Amino acid sequence: NIVPYYLPGVKIQVFHGYAAEKKDHWIIRRYFDTYFTQGPYFTSHFEALAKKYGDFEVLETGWPKQDWIKANLHKYDADREKLLKESGKETLILYAPTFSPKLTSLPYIKEELGKLAKERNALVVMKFHPLTRQEWVDEYREWAANKKDVLFIDKGENVTKYQLMADTLISDTSSTIYEFLLLSRPVITLGTISKDIYWENITEPGQLIAAYDHALTDPEAIAKRQWIVDNYDPYLDGNVCQRMLDGAEDYIRRHGVPKKRKLNLWRKYTSIKTFGRIKKG
């Protein structure tokens, strides 16, 4: 949310993901000429802020990572079918917890994951964040080594591959949740701190299997997932980046390239402290 204000050019805010609940997501720091939003939910909020501040525009483009998702949506289908065939299972569940010791489900959910795999004829694939405590990594790797229906994925492969392969996601408080929901697939969390919950959240590990069944079949749960797709980012058309380029060109065509933005001394100081000064000569 900060840029080197002294560099020439149109300043465009492109978001990292869908973290609408982060405290600074809606803070306007006056650095940007236009905001490229992911979907109607974000657009409506930023359009209201644009009316309030009066010095930036808003364009709904979608999130650029969705172009990659579109291009690779079925790239790993063969890998998925191979895993299911080798394990003799019918469905693939991804367990992707956060690494934060305060927020992670890792100390509590292991045995219930094993029960879920066994009772619902599922292969549970586990992919951990690189910053996960080594003791948890070692514990789960050793546990999975003795099971045919649990697969531990070591470092090196991106979690997005397994998101595309999975039928269901189990997590806690992770950035992967919204990305998976946008595939219109079920999500179950244990003890999430999210305030607006559009998926199944449980407070006890023993509730996992019931929540799994509910997420797959309940009409209200399915409708909530569709609401996220429709409002957070409906642009799985492969044209997000092109809309962004067109939007930037259109802004310059209408306004030219602004020489500078009106910033108070604090914003200028913050920018310089973050990025440094341009050294002349």
Predicted regions located by residue number:
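A donor-sugar binding/catalytic signature common to diverse glycosyltransferases
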Residues: 7-15, 156-199
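Structural alpha-helical scaffold elements that stabilize or flank donor/cofactor-binding regions
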Residues: 28, 86, 161-162
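Catalytic cores of nucleotide-enabled group-transfer and carboxylate-activating enzymes in metabolic
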Residues: 43, 78, 92, 143, ...
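Conserved catalytic-core segment of nucleotide-activated headgroup transferases in glycan assembly
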Residues: 64-142, 236, 240-242
